[in-house]
Amino acid sequence: ADTVDTFPELPILEVGPGMGVLTQFLVKKDRLVKVVEVDYESVAYLREAYPSLEDHIIEDDFLKMNLHRLFDGKPFVLTGNYPYNISSQIFFKMLDNKDIVPCCTGMIQKEVAERIAAGPGSKTYGILSVLIQAWYKVEYLFTVSEHVFNPPPKVKSAVIRMTRNETKELGCDEKLFKQVVKTTFNQRRKTLRNSIKPILGKDCP
């Protein structure tokens, strides 16, 4: 929970709180906390367990939400023990809203965390690595053993922190950059020129 303290003045948005494993620590902080949960039973539990959150529990699908409406367009820290099956989609959503998400922390599958933090030349370096590191500083904080869970999952977990780089400018069209990165890594067997030719058309050298 302390990983959110990089920006202590900002409100917190927790994604997928479930039964409040992380929420119980977040509500003790002297900050505005909102949670987004799509599961009805979890929402009912949270309302009963954390009455102080009553007006800040949002029953919705995070991936479909307009994040600019959550805190009147103001920035916030994104956190959560993210559902492993949609963690990549959550981070793509973060990138689409990077103007209001200066920091993102949380627990994800160890394999995904390693991909996000991977450097150029690494076997795990890919789309997530390039796109997130283009705008955020990535810190792989620590590994979480599967044995701390009951029942234990089949995979290890990891906690990471991504802090937006305020000084870095790409100097190119962001939409085109994302398209080139995704196309290039999805067609690794092709030469770079052949991969991006359909995108650039006549401008491709």
Give each language-model segment a name.
Residues 159-205:
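Flexible helical/loop "lid" subdomain adjacent to adenine-nucleotide binding pockets
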Residues 1-179:
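Catalytic cores of RNA-modifying enzymes
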